């Protein structure tokens, strides 16, 4: 059995790490490189960095901090933010990133996934999906440009349909960002994750809702995800990654422990 992964997420805006609740009201929580180094030291399996305002502004992630992170940490990391071409992806990988992630640009041009797949290989291409649950209709739908509340918009995609499409295009991994759960620390959306898991043949990362160590155990056991992503519980020191991993081992979950 492959070990489950713990993945801290660092949302970056104007050169600082920020965190919001349900993708709104972002506050500064720290500097990029020191936080990245701290999480690597605590035992994170990999890191994800989202330049959350890049796509909404028509910009691309600031590559200067990518190289600084690569110099400081020795675990894999993934970078997202306005990547629209293979050339832009190549530059970010050259600066030291191990994977690139696309979200809004893929919604604008789904064939971008295939082009990145053909250029760099499936294992390098992650697709982030910002999924919103509409209680009125009971539908899960995909939002675009969520890094800027004023720019966020609906798309024509239902979440499960988009999950199937990004796999058809060749993505190597999916991060399901559950917008309703983001930052509220009430647990992952197991019901939605199970629906996605049933049609997802690539590694699936759960994002949105972690508040306790038990929430991580629950999402691994009940939703059968490959990795759990979280932000505020790590940024605010609510959960230590090393202690979390020890807890998960005690629950019988396969996890990589650091020495």
Curated annotation (Swiss-Prot):
Gene3D superfamilies tied to this protein: Aldolase class I
The enzyme's E.C. designation: 4.3.2.10
GO cellular component: cytoplasm
Catalyses which reaction(s): 5-[(5-phospho-1-deoxy-D-ribulos-1-ylimino)methylamino]-1-(5-phospho-beta-D-ribosyl)imidazole-4-carboxamide + L-glutamine = D-erythro-1-(imidazol-4-yl)glycerol 3-phosphate + 5-amino-1-(5-phospho-beta-D-ribosyl)imidazole-4-carboxamide + L-glutamate + H(+)
InterPro entries noted in UniProt: Aldolase_TIM, His_biosynth, HisF, IGPS_HisA/HisF, RibuloseP-bd_barrel
Family assignment from sequence similarity: Belongs to the HisA/HisF family.
Functional description taken from the UniProt entry: IGPS catalyzes the conversion of PRFAR and glutamine to IGP, AICAR and glutamate. The HisF subunit catalyzes the cyclization activity that produces IGP and AICAR from PRFAR using the ammonia provided by the HisH subunit.
Complex formation: Heterodimer of HisH and HisF.
Designated name of the protein: Imidazole glycerol phosphate synthase subunit HisF
Organism (species): Shewanella amazonensis (strain ATCC BAA-1098 / SB2B)
Lineage: Bacteria, Pseudomonadati, Pseudomonadota, Gammaproteobacteria, Alteromonadales
Name of the encoding gene: hisF
